[in-house]
Amino acid sequence: MKKPELLAPGGSLEKLKTAIDYGADAVYIGGEMFSLRVAAENFSKEDMQEGIKYAHDRGKKVYLTANILPHNDDIEEFEEFVKDIKNYGFDAVLVADLGLFDMMQELAPEIPIHVSTQANNINYRSAIKWYKMGATRVVLAREMSFKEIAEFQKKIPEDLELEAFIHGAMCISYSGRCLLSNYMTGRDSNMGACAHPCRWNYKLVEETRPGEYMDVFENERGTFIFNSKDLCTIRHIPELVQSGIASLKIEGRVKTSYYVATVVGAYRREIDRYCADPENYVFNEAEYEELCKVSHRPYTTGFYFGKPDENSQVYTSSSYIIDYDLIGIVK
């Protein structure tokens, strides 16, 4: 049994260091462009180099996210960006677009390529095609079950790694295919500027009665039609490890350092405990309680055990649960 990599979000240099200090094996970060997280602090080129050195000095890895779906105007800028960063020492780059994939191979062939979840990786034939083109890892769509992942593993080459999300926010659509934000606000979700209209509360209008807004009820509290709970799999470490997934990924580049420290620490401890003694492993419920101390929505296991039902949605509010405040950092 191989211990999987624990992959953490690094929305800033401080968060990268926090993730590593609390047990991450690798951190994924974004530059000031191309990384699909406009709201994150992101990394200057100087921060990138400092972060990579910090990680490598401790035997850890840093992956660069370049997983936007670019327009023509982005291509020349991306070429210059790659020329600037290709010698920084990134351990891999995440892309979702075929054009950027091709450019990475042309401009920086020494950097391994991981295919982002934005590419909607939900079947093994797609994964095999990415592998034949040169990808070393495929990030699975969040919409896959353990059963589907097991079948996936049987069909793909042994040296093609799989990465999967284990904690964090869930999109209501297949990642990369939602255009609600573009249509309703002009903010492009595929360029990192999603306004999250899936979590808004909606009213109904009859076309001959403009200005009369009627409530839409799923229950007595109203409706949040697309408002998914957050993914949490801390209680299912045995299934995750036994699935053969190479990298277990935590979502949250726009979250706080406190969030990163708490979530990474909890998963680190449980993964280590299970891998040290699988036969006698018993989940420590205190770790779930730790995860409830960070800003979060109610938790769900997502698609891992089958298609979600109505219990995977939040019907009362689109706001986060915030029951605890950070009062200080002990150094």
Residue ranges, per PLM feature:
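Glycine-rich, positively charged N-terminal anion/phosphate-binding segment
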Residues: R37-Y54
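Active-site PLP-lysine loop of aminotransferase-like
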Residues: I122
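Alpha-helix capping/helix-boundary segments
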Residues: G99-L100
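Surface-exposed amphipathic alpha-helical tracts and adjacent flexible/coil segments at the periphery
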Residues: M1-D21, A26-I29, M33, G51-I52, ...
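Conserved phosphotransfer cores of two-component systems
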Residues: A108
